[in-house]
């Protein structure tokens, strides 16, 4: 993947300003509420039987934060994202059996949460760079499935 200077700077800027403890939980809770079939991967997280339960679930929130910190690896290794996520792809494919389309659903929800946080600063150009980054990560995570 070729990155422009603008794309690199934009991705690094977004993640440097991101409140992981807010954005991560908001992203994962949005994902499992909007796409309830994704809840099957989180059955061990306790009560997730209603929107209120999901919103108050500490394990969902914690995992959302973990996911964002996982994206940090991609930000730090933008020139080698495929290899950066090779082991995580294998884990999600072979052990956790996560449908790879769920990575795209999560990235869409992350885009919505980030756009809401950034407001008018989330221009079309910023969105394009952000979604390009997420697309590369999603493709890398789904690589083991092919």
UniProtKB/Swiss-Prot annotation:
GO biological process per UniProt: hydrogen peroxide catabolic process
Highest taxon listed in the record's lineage: Eukaryota
PROSITE patterns assigned to the protein according to its UniProt record, in alphabetical order: GLOBIN
Amino acids binding heme b: 63, 92
Tissue occurrence: Red blood cells.
InterPro entries reported in the protein's UniProt record: Globin, Globin-like_sf, Globin/Proto, Hemoglobin_b, Hemoglobin_oxygen_transport
Domain annotation Globin: ranges: 2-146
Keywords noted in UniProt: Disulfide bond, Heme, Iron, Metal-binding, Oxygen transport, Transport
Gene Ontology molecular functions: haptoglobin binding; heme binding; metal ion binding; organic acid binding; oxygen binding; oxygen carrier activity; peroxidase activity
Annotated Gene Ontology cellular component terms: blood microparticle; haptoglobin-hemoglobin complex; hemoglobin complex
Task performed by this protein: Involved in oxygen transport from gills to the various peripheral tissues.
Family in the record: Belongs to the globin family.
PANTHER family found in the cross-reference section: HEMOGLOBIN FAMILY MEMBER, HEMOGLOBIN SUBUNIT EPSILON
Assembly, per entry: Heterotetramer of two alpha chains and two beta chains. Can form polymers.
Other comment: Displays a strong alkaline Bohr effect, and at low pH exhibits the reduced ligand affinity and cooperativity that comprise the Root effect.
Identification of the protein by name: Hemoglobin subunit beta
Organism: Chelidonichthys kumu
Lineage: Eukaryota, Metazoa, Chordata, Craniata, Vertebrata
């Amino acid at each position: 993947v070729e990155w422009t200077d603008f794309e690199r700077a934009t991705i690094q800027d977004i993640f440097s300003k991101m409140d992981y403890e807010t954005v991560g939980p908001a992203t994962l809770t949005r994902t499992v509420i909007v796409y309830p079939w994704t809840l099957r991967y989180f059955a061990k997280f306790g009560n997730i039987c209603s929107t209120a339960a999901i919103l108050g679930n500490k394990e969902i929130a914690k995992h959302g934060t973990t996911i964002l910190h996982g994206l940090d690896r991609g930000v730090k290794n933008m020139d080698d994202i495929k290899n950066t996520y090779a082991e995580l792809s294998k884990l999600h494919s072979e052990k956790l059996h996560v449908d790879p389309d769920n990575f795209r659903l999560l990235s869409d929800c992350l885009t919505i949460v980030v756009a809401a946080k950034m407001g008018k600063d989330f221009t079309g150009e910023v969105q394009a760079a952000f979604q390009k980054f997420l697309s590369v990560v999603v493709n890398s995570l789904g690589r083991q499935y092919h």
